[in-house]
Amino acid sequence: MRASISKSSIKGEVFAPPSKSYTHRAITLAALSKESIIHRPLLSADTLATIRASEMFGAAVRREKENLIIQGSNGKPGIPDDVIDAANSGTTLRFMTAIAGLTDGITVLTGDSSLRTRPNGPLLEVLNRLGAKACSTRGNERAPIVVKGGIKGSEVEISGSISSQFISALLIACPLAENSTTLSIIGKLKSRPYVDVTIEMLGLAGVKIHTDDNNGTKFIIPGKQKYDLKQYTVPGDFSSASYLLAAAAMLEGSEITVKNLFPSKQGDKVIIDTLKQMGADITWDMEAGIVTVRGGRKLKAITFDAGSTPDLVPTVAVLASVAEGTSRIENAEHVRYKETDRLHALATELPKMGVSLKEEMDSLTITGGTLEGAEVHGWDDHRIVMSLAIAGMVAGNTIVDTTESVSISYPDFFKDMRNLGAKVKEIPEE
């Protein structure tokens, strides 16, 4: 699908979609518990992949209105009777690869063409040290992956520089190992807030994780624990909401209220402080979970450290494109290992809209100006598509392709934007 986008302003109220990160974790932990109810989960392509994978490990999942009722494996995941297809979901692939190490048999996991390009080497290496046997069928650390269960627990190290999903996956699996595990992070832990979300969720499920140093990069994980996630309500997603907030800040005459944005461990809530730093008219009523943005103010250039919040890079890049001065997005090499190489995708597409941009291995330098309408490629990446779409609302006369990819994290993105008054028309492929 393609979208034709004209100059717009947006007004009204909208609910932030449920958090993808929290939904993935809630489903996964519920599937390892006995019986759980998850209220208001995000049902998107990625989270549906986690549901399907959980069912293959023995969980029973049913939907009742806005809830998921999950009968879990009670800490004993079964052997899947077919290949687990994680589709486009890196979280699903990494979490389920670790859980496969708990079974009494062999599990095969794969994904779509994009997911099969993403690295998994550090996770496979640690699983082997923990007593499982894990390998890539192609010998290149990419899916398809084969795992023979046998995690027993040990003292292991893992790099934190590629993906925090590896660490979260191990934190989820190792509490069910026979023995305790000590997991030490080598180097700087990228995307730390996602690990904090995992530990928060594990605590709600009754699982204990201890940190053994001041930096929080050494985790002591007792074995033979029990999962017991009874009920959980999924919070709103700041990453998905960032496109709504940024659009309103950039578009003159706009004023929107985004609900269901309460304080949480999500690192992406920094989008609110980022917009304030850039000079946007934005307020956050934390107690009510309501963020209000009014457009019209000229935005100022900033330096943005993407180390903890890689998913905000496309949003911030578009904001920088209209800001006065030169902005720098740095500490961002790990953004290259997402659904696409997002730094390269942004460096390719934004100049088509008149943006002056310099790409380096771990950074983007962007000089703000006037966005121009163009036909741009969405790279079949939900975050690239949504960021280019809001750029198109500023520029007008813009066409973005591969718009169906928004189903990964925010299926109602274009619907919500149209309801707020954005001039967006979806064009079926011929």
UniProtKB/Swiss-Prot annotation:
Reaction it catalyzes: 3-phosphoshikimate + phosphoenolpyruvate = 5-O-(1-carboxyvinyl)-3-phosphoshikimate + phosphate
One GO term (biological process): aromatic amino acid family biosynthetic process
Sequence positions that bind 3-phosphoshikimate: K20, S21, R25, S163, S164, Q165, S191, D311, K338
Top-rank taxon: Archaea
Binding-site residues for phosphoenolpyruvate, renumbered to this chain: K20, G90, R118, Q165, R342, R383
GO cellular component: cytoplasm
Catalytic residues of the enzyme: D311
Pathway(s) where this gene product acts: Metabolic intermediate biosynthesis; chorismate biosynthesis
EC code: 2.5.1.19
Assembly mode: Monomer.
Pfam families: EPSP_synthase
Keyword annotations of the record: Amino-acid biosynthesis, Aromatic amino acid biosynthesis, Cytoplasm, Transferase
Protein name: 3-phosphoshikimate 1-carboxyvinyltransferase
UniProt xrefs under CDD domains: EPSP_synthase (cd01556)
Function, in words: Catalyzes the transfer of the enolpyruvyl moiety of phosphoenolpyruvate (PEP) to the 5-hydroxyl of shikimate-3-phosphate (S3P) to produce enolpyruvyl shikimate-3-phosphate and inorganic phosphate.
Similarity comment: family membership: Belongs to the EPSP synthase family.
Any one GO molecular function term: 3-phosphoshikimate 1-carboxyvinyltransferase activity
Subcellular localization, as worded in the UniProt entry: Cytoplasm
Native source species: Methanosarcina mazei (strain ATCC BAA-159 / DSM 3647 / Goe1 / Go1 / JCM 11833 / OCM 88) (Methanosarcina frisia)
Primary location recorded for the protein, binned into one broad class: cytoplasm
